[in-house]
C-alpha cells in the first residue's frame, strides 16, 4: 500500500487467487493525524500520565479504510535486563473501526483484538515487547527483545 496524503490517493496491490497482481487506486479524504507505520515511535514517546491518545491509520482490508488507534497507559510491568530489575511501561492499543462496521464487527465476532506494547521510558525510550496480530485475522504474536526476562504470568 502506498499513500499520497497531499493528494488523498491510496494505492493497494493484492494478489488474486489465480496469482495475478491487482492494483487499486482509491481517492480518500485523509485526516491530518494519519500515522501509518509510526505506531511504535508514537507509543515510545507517550506520557505514562496521559489518559489516552488517538491517531488515525489506513488499513487495507482489502479496500483501504481509515481506522482510529486508541492508545492508553496500563501501568508498569517488572522485567530484568542483564540482571538488573527494571519496569516496563505497558500500553493498550484498541482499534476503533468506526461507522456501521464498528457497530457490527463485535456482534459477529469480527472485532479486532487489542494490541499490547511495552516500552522502557526515559530520555531515550526503548521498545521492549508487543503482543497482538500483525494483520487482519492474523494470529496473536509476541515480539520481544532478546535480552529482557519477564514474569511467566505476563500476557
Feature names for model-found ranges:
Residues 1-63:
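Contiguous hydrophobic, core-forming segments of folded domains
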Residues 1-6, 50-155:
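Acidic, serine/threonine-rich low-complexity disordered tracts
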Amino acid at each position: 500500500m502506498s499513500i499520497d496524503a497531499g493528494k488523498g490517493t491510496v494505492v493497494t496491490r493484492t494478489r488474486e487467487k489465480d496469482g495475478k497482481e491487482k492494483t487499486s487506486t482509491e481517492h480518500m479524504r485523509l485526516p491530518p493525524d494519519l500515522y501509518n507505520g509510526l505506531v511504535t515511535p508514537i507509543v515510545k514517546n507517550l506520557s505514562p500520565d496521559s489518559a489516552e491518545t488517538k491517531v488515525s491509520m489506513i488499513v487495507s482490508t482489502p479496500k483501504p479504510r481509515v481506522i482510529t488507534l486508541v492508545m492508553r497507559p496500563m501501568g508498569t510491568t517488572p522485567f530484568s535486563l542483564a540482571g538488573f530489575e527494571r519496569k516496563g511501561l505497558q500500553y493498550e492499543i484498541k482499534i476503533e473501526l468506526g461507522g456501521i462496521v464498528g457497530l457490527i464487527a463485535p456482534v459477529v465476532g469480527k472485532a479486532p483484538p487489542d494490541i499490547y506494547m511495552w516500552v522502557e521510558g526515559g530520555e531515550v525510550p526503548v521498545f521492549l515487547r508487543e503482543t497482538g496480530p500483525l494483520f487482519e485475522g492474523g494470529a496473536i504474536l509476541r515480539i520481544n527483545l532478546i535480552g529482557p526476562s519477564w514474569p511467566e504470568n505476563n500476557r
